[in-house]
Design a protein with these regions (language model features):
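Trp/Gly-enriched beta-strand/coil motifs that build multi-repeat beta-propeller-like domains
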Residues: 1-159
Length: 159
């Protein structure tokens, strides 16, 4: 695993290759951490503040996403563990299961007028795309039966 550092040079970050990788400020210090799934037998690790590696979970992920679900400035880590459902690591503290089903795709974004990010998941054909709104409940007005190849969230109309 390599990183392009300070727009100047490639620097090795870890000797293993990643199966999933994302970045987010999960400790609310203004600096992004690198969240890496190194695969079966190694699990998910976080590179904190460009200094130390810390294990986040021993299992490997089907998908990883981040978003500030409670609007406290710390990104929460969402992980689909195949066969175990969708889980969130909140505020660097505890794991909590968000759904017993394992989604095919996960993304986050603030898609309403509230301040926190929503979780948008694709549970696949027959179940569809669902939204976990305002850090409280699954939206029953989801796109039932619809599935996607990719998911994304953005404010395209400026509201």
């Amino acid at each position: 695993l390599w990183v392009w550092m300070n727009n100047a040079s490639w620097v090795p970050l870890h000797p293993f290759s990643a199966t999933h990788i994302t970045t987010a400020d999960i400790d609310n210090n203004g600096q992004d951490e690198v969240i890496v799934d190194f695969g079966p037998g190694i699990g998910i690790w976080v590179f904190f503040n460009n200094t130390t590696w810390q294990s986040l979970h021993p299992l490997t992920a089907g998908a990883i996403a981040t978003g500030d679900l409670d609007n406290n400035g710390e990104a929460d880590v969402l992980v689909h563990f195949p066969g175990f459902g969708l889980w969130v690591h909140r505020n660097g503290a505890n794991w909590e299961q968000l759904h017993f089903l394992s989604p095919e795709l996960i993304t986050t974004g603030n898609i309403d007028t509230e301040s926190e990010d929503e979780v948008i998941v694709d549970f696949g054909p027959g179940i569809g795309i669902w939204i976990f709104r305002n850090n409280t409940a699954w939206d029953g007005a989801a796109l039932l039966g619809v599935s996607a190849d990719h998911l994304g969230a953005a404010d395209i109309d400026g509201n």
